Amino acid sequence: MAFISTPLGKVTVKSATVSANRRGLRMQSDSEPVVSRRALLSGALAAAVAAALARARPAQARIDYEGIGYLGGGDKIDVNNANVRAYRKFPGLYPTAAKKIVQGGPYGTPDDILKNPELSERDKEVIKKYMDRFVALPPTPEYFTDRVNNGIYK
């Protein structure tokens, strides 16, 4: 009696033979196989089809956003879509006033920033100093949701 180890556990076999030829070792037994060849191949085919159908799809992100220059890389900042870190280039705004600006949006015009009840008088003075450097473009979901924390850390 022999024990043959398979993926499904050990199988008891009355007799087993092992022979060698040019292609390698071959093992034979007198018992029925635990898994038929047809079941094994159809399972492998099903797994391959499932893997092909579940492959990753490309992101449908918009890469040609017309306001990209106003997100912090230029001289002007879009108050509706720019991240809070974009205000670092304006002394006195980052982080406190910038956070209040970002959380108070969206704005119709840059002047609407001054209507934010969270701003102190000092914040408003500093904002007025840079008012000509702000634009208010329509909020876009791709950037509006990441204004406070866009996940980029330096």
Curated annotation (Swiss-Prot):
Assembly and oligomerization: PSII is composed of 1 copy each of membrane proteins PsbA, PsbB, PsbC, PsbD, PsbE, PsbF, PsbH, PsbI, PsbJ, PsbK, PsbL, PsbM, PsbT, PsbY, PsbZ, Psb30/Ycf12, at least 3 peripheral proteins of the oxygen-evolving complex and a large number of cofactors. It forms dimeric complexes. The extrinsic subunits in red algae are PsbO (OEC33), PsbQ', cytochrome c-550 and PsbU.
Family annotation (PROSITE patterns): TAT
Transit peptide, residues from-to: 1-36, 37-61
Pfam families noted in UniProt: PsbU
Processing after translation: Predicted to be translocated into the thylakoid lumen by the Tat system. The position of the first transit peptide cleavage has not been experimentally proven.
InterPro entries noted in UniProt: PSII_PsbU, TAT_signal
Gene3D superfamilies with a match to the protein in the record: Photosystem II 12 kDa extrinsic protein (1.10.150.320)
One GO term (biological process): photosystem II stabilization
Reported function: One of the extrinsic, lumenal subunits of photosystem II (PSII). PSII is a light-driven water plastoquinone oxidoreductase, using light energy to abstract electrons from H(2)O, generating a proton gradient subsequently used for ATP formation. The extrinsic proteins stabilize the structure of photosystem II oxygen-evolving complex (OEC), the ion environment of oxygen evolution and protect the OEC against heat-induced inactivation.
GO cellular component, one term: chloroplast thylakoid membrane
Matching SUPFAM superfamilies: PsbU/PolX domain-like (SSF81585)
Topology with respect to the bilayer: Peripheral membrane protein
NCBIfam families reported in the protein's UniProt record: PRK02515.1
Subcellular location: Plastid, Chloroplast thylakoid membrane
Keywords assigned by UniProt, alphabetized: Chloroplast, Electron transport, Membrane, Photosynthesis, Photosystem II, Plastid, Thylakoid, Transit peptide, Transport
UniProt record similarity statement: Belongs to the PsbU family.
Organism: Cyanidium caldarium
Disulfide bonds: none
Name of the protein: Photosystem II extrinsic protein U, chloroplastic
